[in-house]
Amino acid sequence: MRFYFGKEEMSSLISPYDFTEVTRQLRSFFDEKGFQEVHTQNRLSILAACEDPTTVATYEYSGQIWPLPQTGQMWLEYELLTKPELPGCYCLSTSYRQEQNPTEGRHELIFPMFEFEAPGNFKDLLQMENDLCKHLGFKCDHGRSPFTEDFPGGNYMSMVAHYAAADNELLAFHESRMYEEYGDVFFLTEFPEYTSPFWNMKIGGTGPKDVKLANKCDVIMGGMETIGSAERATDVQEMKEQFYTISNGEYANLLFDLFGKDRVELELFKFLSHNFVPRYGGGIGVTRIISAMKRAGLIVND
């Protein structure tokens, strides 16, 4: 069933059986690792907007304008950076994405998201996501493009070449082809800077023509990006520079236009005042992981 506001489709209704089954499995995985659950939905933040500035919507509350939250990531970062004894933390929240041209079956304008943050590096992130996929029941029955311990994958630029992608950009139909070629799970990593990785993602090495590469991993599940994750940056100057230049500067300028430059920079500089340590994090689209698990025959609540 779809939910409409006027004539505009907003989101689909999620079966409580599917939602309970998937979130139970996600929680159990992170609970076993000693992660703490954080309630982020009652925390207001300007930086709770993702990297695509065209999807940001706003609301007025208590006399101020705020962005409808798209991620709880910054609050998980806050908990991790102010409580270094934590082995990790996670949250389950609602993400509002005002997609300009949503694709049916792929984009939800409002959806639940399960997010996590933990100390560690990019290698630790890939291992954790490998283990999470196994925990959820995913398997790989072939040896094509082995990448992690149990699943196939490849870096962004190699997959651009593999599919001869126009404009050096991978699109939704390329993700569908990854499913057809490699199966239920594919690890897509090392995104070039021109794809506008979020401003607090760590820039690792360089690719062809000295293109900077972010330590970012999208886990393609059931033919769609389902887990978006990355190693976080520790260099304050690097994060500051990326904040002002992401999406060709549109991200910062849109936030300035909506909420005022002084207000935005106050929140940014407060975040950048933390003592940064190696860490990683990511977000899991709950509707997409339900879809992927159904496609793999791992959910049979219908």
Predicted ranges, named:
Residues 126-137:
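Short amphipathic C-terminal alpha-helix that caps PH/PH-like domains
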